[in-house]
UniProtKB/Swiss-Prot annotation:
It holds the Pfam family NADHdh. It comes from Nitrosomonas eutropha (strain DSM 101675 / C91 / Nm57). One of its GO terms (molecular function) is oxidoreductase activity, acting on NAD(P)H, quinone or similar compound as acceptor. The gene is nuoH. Belongs to the complex I subunit 1 family. It comes from the Bacteria. This is NADH-quinone oxidoreductase subunit H.
Length: 365
């Protein structure tokens, strides 16, 4: 791609050419992330419907196909759903704040997409390789709740407002638990750079992955990620049987679809971060032939798919928790466990070098 830089310099001059080339390069890299992500979101909805249908002994979507090919039945369903959503009218309720009503979906989707700027798919395949990547992701994922709160308030509906308040309290509660769980990863890797975190898990086998010594933190992080994305069994922000549809009860058409995209993009982000920080990222489970011949991106995508399967499995299996049960789990279970684990991990890391070299501590320190 850098071979096009002289062409830009010839067309626009030395100074402008370099600036325009860098701008075009970054825009192409952004599109190279966003377009596959949106396709992944679309087909994650298809996978969800097929997997849950299988668990409930149903068929699932099997009609919409490409070019009439029978064995592709159902694979065109996400495209059909997207076209239908685009063609639907966006109805703004009477008494709603029109500007904020339309701004809320944008505020929800923007952080969900912006967080991917620092996510590495391999040592070379990353848009922005910054040293504070983990801090940046925590900041971006925290901003998504503003779109939900504004949507609930701008709708001028008590059901939407209740859903927004539930979502805000839930995100604040589980954001703390997620942050404390990631502090343990930071302590073990001594870095906020996601590439360095993966490099710290190298060692020849899955026994060096942070999931082994930090297994309780892995569970806390993943369950908190499910709660933060408002997925079952933590979907009290929507709560169809309680508050109709929560914060997006009055949304329709593309505005509703953007909320939908943000939720599924956040699901993929949580699964990706769990794979990078606890499951070795793009590292193979065993560094021997034939495992190390498979590209690292394939290993990362496989781990992400496994994590996403658990998201879908939870939806088909568990009933919705009550709101008070969700708050109790976050504040009285997860946060105390993470704080205790941080203290224990810090104490272990202060042991003498001889103790750290004994089995099994020598696997992890």
């Amino acid at each position: 791609m850098d071979s096009f830089q002289p062409l830009f310099e010839q067309l626009f001059g030395s100074e402008w050419g370099v600036s325009l080339f860098l701008l075009a390069k970054n825009l192409l890299l952004i599109l190279a992330i966003i377009i596959p992500l949106l396709l992944a979101v679309a087909y994650l909805t298809f996978a969800e419907r097929k997997i849950i249908a299988f668990m409930q002994v149903r068929v699932g979507p099997n009609r919409v196909t490409f070019f009439g090919i029978p064995w592709l039945g159902g694979w065109g369903q996400p495209i059909a759903d997207a076209v239908k959503a685009i063609m639907k009218e966006i109805i703004i309720p009477t008494g709603a704040n029109k500007f904020l009503f339309l701004l809320a979906p944008i505020l929800a989707i923007t952080p969900a997409l912006a967080a991917w700027a620092v996510v590495p798919f391999s040592p070379e395949l990353v848009l922005a390789d910054i040293n504070a990547a983990l801090l940046y992701i925590l900041a971006m994922t925290s901003l998504g709740v503003y779109g939900v709160i504004i949507a609930g308030w701008a709708s001028n509906s008590k059901y939407a407002f209740l859903g927004a308040m539930r979502s805000a309290a839930q995100v604040i509660s589980y954001e703390l638990a997620m942050g404390f769980a990631l502090v343990c990863v930071l302590m073990m890797s001594s870095s906020l750079n996601l590439g360095d975190i993966v490099a710290g898990q190298q060692g020849g086998s899955f026994l060096n992955w942070y999931m082994i010594p930090l297994f309780p933190m892995f569970l806390v992080y993943f369950i908190s990620g499910v709660a933060e994305t408002n997925r079952l069994p933590f979907d009290v922000a929507e709560g169809e049987s309680e508050i109709v549809a929560g914060f997006h009860v009055d949304y329709s058409g593309m505005a509703f679809t953007i909320f939908f995209l943000a939720e599924y993009a956040n699901m993929i982000l949580v699964a990706t971060l769990a794979s990078i920080m606890f499951l070795g990222g793009w590292l193979p489970p065993v560094d021997i032939i034939p495992f190390n011949l498979i590209p690292g991106v394939v290993w990362l995508l496989l781990k992400i798919a496994i994590m996403l399967f658990f998201f879908l499995w939870f939806r088909a299996t568990f009933p919705r928790y009550r709101y008070d049960q969700i708050m109790r789990l976050g504040w009285k279970v997860f946060i105390p466990i993470t704080l205790i684990w941080i203290v224990l991990l810090g104490a272990v890391m202060q042991l003498p070098e001889a103790a750290l070299q004994s089995f099994p501590l020598n696997l992890w320190f």
